[in-house]
């Protein structure tokens, strides 16, 4: 006899399962109300005596309830019905229910250790993880082909970010186009953000833009200090006008303006650093941010950019105070320092920045270094030109721009024709291939000669 399960597939008749179910119900009632082993076997014989080739599992359970009541075991029948109902609830509940309960109770080891940058006991992080559990369940059951899910479970591949995949409007990592938003204005939550006129203001707005972008994606992001350099000049011009209006001498105007600027740059960098580390995105963490320091991105504002880079490195060397007042290395932002001709040659104008970066690395293990020369050799755009640009967040690099023929499809107001487009671009759909597994399961022996 075959038993038809609730999902439609058939299994062999197994009388032991009936014995187990009734015995579990037996334990819930008084001894005189229990069914004896003979009575249980009689119920099994009755079902087998029906002579059916196939029988629904629900029909079997109905027969058991009817037979228990026919021999006066009403309380036992009631307990069996309860047991049957409980099993039905368990069947209906999926892994999502259990994962959510374990997360809320702090018992889910996976979510507790899933991301070292997130504390699973914090409410904002739990909210993100709750959404992630639901997204993962939907992704596995409805969105991904079965062979992809199987390959992921077997470790052949790793399908990243299933906890965000269900919401297809989200993307992974990106390079934030701060230049466009700061120079041409933008809006956050329906509030117009106009072009700032001071470096300190620009740094504050930058942190708000970064947080807004980070809350609309699930990967890391990167900005470049080049986009903030023009506002150093704006601040300098502000101070020059301020002291010039006071009818001071040219020397006094230059002196006082330089002193004001010397104070504003550290204030702006400090504001930026504390804002980034104290803000929380919808992902339940501080923005996963990297900051690029690339002198070669600008000629017009190179000196102003050097001022910002110097201050960023100095403050990173100092560190940030933790809750106990001890200076530590902040997790974010990560720093990316581009090595180029002007800063790798001891006689170069900006070599002092590389020396400062090296001291920072020795103490804080940042910045990471990017070789302009090597990148331009490897990142060739469709026009045949090598380009240098930062990674997004921690490690992912965009592909070289191959879309020169389509023009300004993003409608960016800072678009430059025939110049590679990188800021404002993102990646999506990261999958890791387990190459050792592929090699070992290929069944081929590859012999290499020295």
Question: Residue ranges of each PLM-predicted region?
Answer:
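Conserved catalytic cores of very large enzyme subunits
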Residues: 89-90, 96-450
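Charged, amphipathic alpha-helical regulatory modules used
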Residues: 1-106
């Amino acid at each position: 006899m075959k038993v038809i399960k609730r999902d439609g597939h058939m299994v062999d008749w197994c009388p032991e399962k009936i014995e187990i179910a009734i015995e579990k119900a037996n334990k819930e009632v008084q001894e005189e109300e229990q069914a004896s082993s003979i009575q249980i076997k009689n119920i099994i014989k009755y079902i087998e005596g029906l002579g059916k080739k196939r029988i629904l599992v629900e029909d079997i359970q109905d027969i058991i309830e009817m037979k228990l009541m026919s021999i006066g075991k009403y309380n036992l029948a009631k307990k069996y019905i309860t047991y049957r109902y409980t099993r039905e609830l368990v069947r209906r509940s999926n892994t999502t229910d259990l994962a959510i309960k374990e997360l809320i109770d702090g018992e889910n080891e996976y979510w507790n250790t899933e991301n070292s940058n997130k504390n699973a006991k914090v409410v904002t992080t739990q909210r993100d993880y709750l959404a992630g559990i639901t997204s993962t369940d939907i992704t596995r059951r409805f969105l991904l082909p079965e062979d992809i899910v199987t390959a992921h479970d077997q470790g052949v591949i790793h399908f990243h970010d299933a906890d965000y995949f269900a919401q297809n409007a989200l993307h992974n990592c990106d390079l934030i186009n701060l230049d466009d938003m700061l120079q041409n204005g933008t809006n956050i939550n329906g509030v117009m953000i106009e072009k700032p006129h001071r470096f300190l203001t620009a740094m504050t707005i930058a942190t708000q833009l970064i947080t807004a972008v980070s809350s609309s994606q699930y990967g890391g992001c990167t900005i470049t200090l080049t986009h903030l350099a023009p506002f150093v000049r704006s601040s300098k011009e502000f101070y020059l006008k301020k002291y010039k209006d006071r009818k001071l001498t040219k020397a006094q105007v230059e002196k006082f303006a330089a002193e004001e600027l010397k104070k504003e740059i550290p204030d702006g960098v400090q504001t930026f650093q504390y804002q980034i580390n104290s803000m929380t995105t919808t992902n339940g963490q501080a923005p996963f941010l990297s900051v690029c320091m690339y002198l070669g991105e600008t000629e017009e504002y190179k000196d102003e950019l050097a001022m910002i880079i110097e201050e960023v490195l100095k403050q990173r060397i100092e560190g940030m105070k933790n809750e106990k007042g001890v200076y530590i290395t902040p997790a974010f932002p990560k720093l990316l320092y581009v090595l180029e001709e002007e800063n790798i040659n001891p006689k170069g104008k900006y070599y002092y920045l590389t020396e400062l970066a090296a001291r920072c690395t020795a103490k804080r293990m940042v910045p990471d270094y990017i070789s302009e020369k090597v990148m331009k050799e490897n990142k060739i755009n469709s026009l045949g030109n090598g380009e240098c640009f930062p990674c997004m967040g921690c490690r992912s690099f965009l592909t070289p721009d191959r879309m020169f023929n389509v023009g300004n499809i993003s409608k960016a107001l800072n678009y430059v024709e025939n110049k590679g487009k990188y800021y404002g671009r993102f990646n999506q759909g990261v999958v890791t291939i387990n190459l050792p597994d592929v090699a070992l399961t290929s069944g081929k022996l590859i012999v290499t000669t020295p």
